[in-house]
Amino acid sequence: MGKRSQKSSVLMVCVGNLCRSPIAEAVMRDLVARAGLQGEWHVESAGIEDWHSGHQPDERALNVLARHNIEYNGKARVLAPEDFLEFDYIFAMDLSNLAALRRMAPKGTTAKLLILGNFGLKPDERIIEDPYYDIGEASFEEIYRQCSIACRNFLKQARLKQIM
């Protein structure tokens, strides 16, 4: 990962690693692959809570990714203390996630803790809302849209070394 290799590393985080962070991970991996940058980037996702470890993402998330021709085979995992040292960037989907990340970060954390939506989304769209209890896939499609914009902008800024 980031600190063990020359690759830059990104960890996408939401509450349970079932809906938002797997979509963000899949979108980021797809963008990296399309740009031919697989040798430069390592991307994963995790959940703050250990409610769903080992499970596949929500079926609605997988359906939306499939509609956009993006494969995803990951399984949910919980955020680990070492993630804060091994990843360069850890992205929260909302302010609650960010607050939890800040509380959980061990002393000496080297990762940048950021809100994914701050990269290219309008101020009123920057929070990527949890769709877990929503009916249907419309909110998952919106998450895909938000993640696509934010990941594209982050990758562009990171490659230009514009991330502080």
Curated annotation (Swiss-Prot):
* Cellular component GO terms held in the UniProt record: cytoplasm
Protein name (database record) = Low molecular weight phosphotyrosine protein phosphatase 2
Keyword terms of this UniProt record: Cytoplasm, Hydrolase, Protein phosphatase
Query: What does the protein in this record do?
Result: Catalyzes the dephosphorylation of tyrosine phosphorylated proteins and low-MW aryl phosphates. Can contribute to the regulation of a variety of developmental processes.
Q: Known EC number(s)?
A: 3.1.3.48, 3.1.3.2
Report any Pfam family annotated for this entry.
Answer: LMWPc
Any idea where this protein resides? Cytoplasm
What result is annotated for mutating residue 14 to S? Complete loss of activity
Q: Could you tell me which Gene3D superfamilies the record lists for this protein? A: 3.40.50.2300
Protein family: Belongs to the low molecular weight phosphotyrosine protein phosphatase family.
Tissue specificity: Cone cells and primary pigment cells in developing pupal retina.
InterPro entries named among the record's database cross-references: LMW_PTPase, Ptyr_pPase, Ptyr_pPase_sf, Tyr_Pase_low_mol_wt_mml, Tyr_phospatase_low_mol_wt
Enzyme class per UniProt? hydrolase
Decide whether keyword Cytoplasm is in the record.
yes
Please list the GO terms describing molecular function: acid phosphatase activity; non-membrane spanning protein tyrosine phosphatase activity; protein tyrosine phosphatase activity
In terms of superkingdom, the source organism counts as Eukaryota
Gene giving rise to this polypeptide: primo-2
Q: Which organism is it from?
A: Drosophila melanogaster
Which transformation does this protein catalyse, written as a reaction? Answer: O-phospho-L-tyrosyl-[protein] + H2O = L-tyrosyl-[protein] + phosphate; a phosphate monoester + H2O = an alcohol + phosphate
Active site positions: 14 (nucleophile), 20, 130 (proton donor)
